[in-house]
């Protein structure tokens, strides 16, 4: 990490179909080897599947799923006098979103369905109903923070 100054935030353009910035960030995270058109196809088809399953606006479902995955606290390691403590820290909004996106993609990739579209649609539907691997990851993170609440005075 550079000590001189923080890296500039890059401008992300909204996606073509829904005009949503968060969806673009999601696609960029899903993209492999710079193949954005493939990532777009996967996301749009997954959202169409979600729409046919639960008859709601797909972009609303996507945002609700992300909200259900976003962690409010996490633990960070802090070394104090030879011992390493897991200190609970509140998560900044940008990091919340980034973690939720990352967890959702990882959970979708680890599912058993045949295509990535099916996996992503399934994980989105699970996340909306507050179940699934990505939501479990958030719950585990919150449990870790709760268990280490005693060390919260070591914040920095």
Curated annotation (Swiss-Prot):
A cellular component term, taken from the record's GO annotations: small ribosomal subunit
Gene3D superfamilies: Ribosomal protein S7 domain (1.10.455.10)
Cysteine-cysteine disulfides: none
InterPro entries associated with the record: Ribosomal_uS7 (IPR000235), Ribosomal_uS7_bac/org-type (IPR005717), Ribosomal_uS7_CS (IPR020606), Ribosomal_uS7_dom (IPR023798), Ribosomal_uS7_dom_sf (IPR036823)
Keyword DNA damage: no
UniProt entry keywords in alphabetical sequence: Ribonucleoprotein, Ribosomal protein, RNA-binding, rRNA-binding, tRNA-binding
Domain of life according to the entry: Bacteria
Segments passing through the bilayer: none
GO biological process: translation
Pfam families assigned: Ribosomal_S7 (PF00177)
Gene Ontology MF: a single term: rRNA binding
SUBUNIT field: Part of the 30S ribosomal subunit. Contacts proteins S9 and S11.
Stated family: Belongs to the universal ribosomal protein uS7 family.
Function (record text): One of the primary rRNA binding proteins, it binds directly to 16S rRNA where it nucleates assembly of the head domain of the 30S subunit. Is located at the subunit interface close to the decoding center, probably blocks exit of the E-site tRNA.
Protein name per its UniProtKB record: Small ribosomal subunit protein uS7
Gene (UniProt): rpsG
């Amino acid at each position: 990490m550079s000590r001189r100054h923080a890296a500039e935030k890059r401008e992300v353009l909204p996606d073509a179909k829904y005009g949503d910035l968060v969806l673009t960030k999601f696609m960029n995270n899903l993209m492999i080897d710079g193949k954005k058109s493939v990532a777009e196809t996967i996301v749009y088809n997954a959202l169409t599947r979600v729409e046919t399953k639960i008859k709601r606006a797909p972009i609303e479902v996507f945002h609700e799923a992300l909200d259900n995955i976003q962690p409010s606290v996490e633990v960070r390691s802090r070394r104090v006098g030879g011992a390493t403590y897991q200190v609970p820290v509140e998560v900044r909004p940008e990091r919340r979103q980034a973690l939720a996106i990352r967890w959702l993609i990882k959970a979708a990739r680890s599912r058993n369905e045949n295509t990535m579209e099916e996996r992503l649609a399934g994980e989105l539907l699970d996340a909306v109903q507050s179940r699934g691997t990505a939501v479990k990851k958030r719950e585990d993170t919150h449990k870790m923070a709760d268990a280490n609440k005693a060390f919260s005075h070591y914040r920095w």
